[in-house]
């Protein structure tokens, strides 16, 4: 490594924590960690620290949790750290140009897509949902636009027919830190230069919400199968049967036709449901108050509940 840098790290979820963990194993000095304020979580709505905050405190690092970085006081606090570089990973706050200009080498971001495809908040899930053949991590030099900065480094990985949002997340969380460390070395040595993104190729990965996780049986089965995988483990696709909510955590393409949402067949292989085009076989479900189960287990004990002819989602 050419030189050890003073680095400010900014990130919030587990994906970001994996990057911080890797940086802590380098000679670089993490002079402060920025993360989102503690948020209410769980049934008790108790204030919970982020994954990044927990890791930072374990290592005795100073933790900053500003509500915003747009005010002069927060910017002066950042400037006082005399950072060479700011590494930003899924932080969740907009960084104004005044902040981007503070570190000597600027700010870099590890983004979980092959930019310019899937700029925005949910690139991992949108890639699976869209049926993309590959995904990856892009390390970019940040600018004021959303994920629009010059690309410093890209690493890619195929998306398999079995990948879920969770499995792809974990793979990218392993690839991203290595790419960031390589990019930092190139920046420090002055050998790495950004490639301008082609805005004409840009797509936007809208933030996930629970409302869109409701399965629309009028859609083609191939799209619903990808949606189930993309939204596992969160927000988890769901439907209803006889007014009872039903979470769908696993599905495969099946054969059959009928009115959308109609149960065509129940067997140990799964619950076959007619879609707008084709049919979807539900293979892993969660009933109210229960845990996720393979449909074969539900079929053994509740087969009468899943009789053919019933309509899901009504």
Swiss-Prot record:
Q: What is one Pfam family matched by this protein? A: Formyl_trans_C
Q: Which PROSITE patterns match?
A: GART
The source's superkingdom equals Bacteria
Q: Which residues bind (6S)-5,6,7,8-tetrahydrofolate?
A: 113-116
- In which family does this protein belong, per the annotation? Belongs to the Fmt family.
Q: Gene Ontology terms, cellular component aspect?
A: cytosol
What would be the name of the gene that encodes this protein?
fmt
Which top EC class applies here? transferase
Function description: Attaches a formyl group to the free amino group of methionyl-tRNA(fMet). The formyl group appears to play a dual role in the initiator identity of N-formylmethionyl-tRNA by promoting its recognition by IF2 and preventing the misappropriation of this tRNA by the elongation apparatus.
- The protein's Enzyme Commission number: 2.1.2.9
What is the originating organism of this protein?
Pseudomonas aeruginosa (strain LESB58)
Q: What is this protein called?
A: Methionyl-tRNA formyltransferase
Q: Does the keyword Protein biosynthesis apply?
A: yes
Recall the GO molecular function terms of this protein's record.
Answer: methionyl-tRNA formyltransferase activity
Catalytic reactions of this protein: L-methionyl-tRNA(fMet) + (6R)-10-formyltetrahydrofolate = N-formyl-L-methionyl-tRNA(fMet) + (6S)-5,6,7,8-tetrahydrofolate + H(+)
């Amino acid at each position: 490594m050419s030189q050890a840098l003073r680095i400010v790290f900014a990130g919030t979820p587990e994906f970001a924590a994996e990057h911080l963990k890797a940086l802590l194993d380098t000679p670089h000095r993490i002079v402060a960690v920025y993360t989102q304020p503690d948020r209410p979580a769980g049934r008790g709505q108790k204030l919970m620290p982020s994954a990044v905050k927990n890791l930072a405190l374990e290592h005795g690092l100073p933790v900053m949790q500003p509500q915003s970085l747009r005010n002069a006081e927060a910017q002066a606090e950042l400037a006082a750290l005399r950072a060479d570089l700011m590494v930003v990973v899924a932080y969740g706050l907009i960084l104004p140009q005044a902040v981007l200009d503070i570190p000597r080498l600027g700010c870099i971001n590890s983004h979980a897509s092959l930019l310019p495809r899937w700029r925005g908040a949910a690139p991992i899930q949108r890639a699976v949902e869209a049926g993309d053949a590959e995904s990856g991590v892009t390390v970019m030099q940040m600018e004021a636009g959303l994920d629009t900065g010059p690309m410093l480094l890209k690493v890619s990985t195929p998306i398999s027919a079995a990948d879920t949002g969770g499995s792809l997340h974990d793979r990218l969380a392993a690839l991203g830190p290595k790419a960031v460390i390589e990019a930092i070395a190139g920046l420090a040595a002055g050998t790495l230069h950004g490639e301008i993104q082609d805005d004409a190729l840009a797509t936007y990965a809208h933030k996930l919400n629970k409302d869109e996780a409701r399965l629309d049986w009028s859609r083609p089965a191939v799209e619903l199968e990808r949606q189930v995988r993309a939204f596992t483990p969160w927000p988890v696709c769901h439907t209803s049967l006889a007014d009872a909510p039903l979470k769908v955590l696993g599905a495969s393409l099946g054969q059959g036709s009928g009115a959308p949402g109609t149960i065509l067949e129940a067997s140990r292989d799964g619950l076959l449901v007619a879609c707008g085009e084709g049919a979807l076989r539900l293979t892993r479900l969660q009933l109210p108050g229960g845990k996720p189960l393979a449909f074969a287990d539900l079929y053994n004990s509740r087969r009468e509940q899943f009789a053919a002819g019933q309509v899901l989602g009504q």
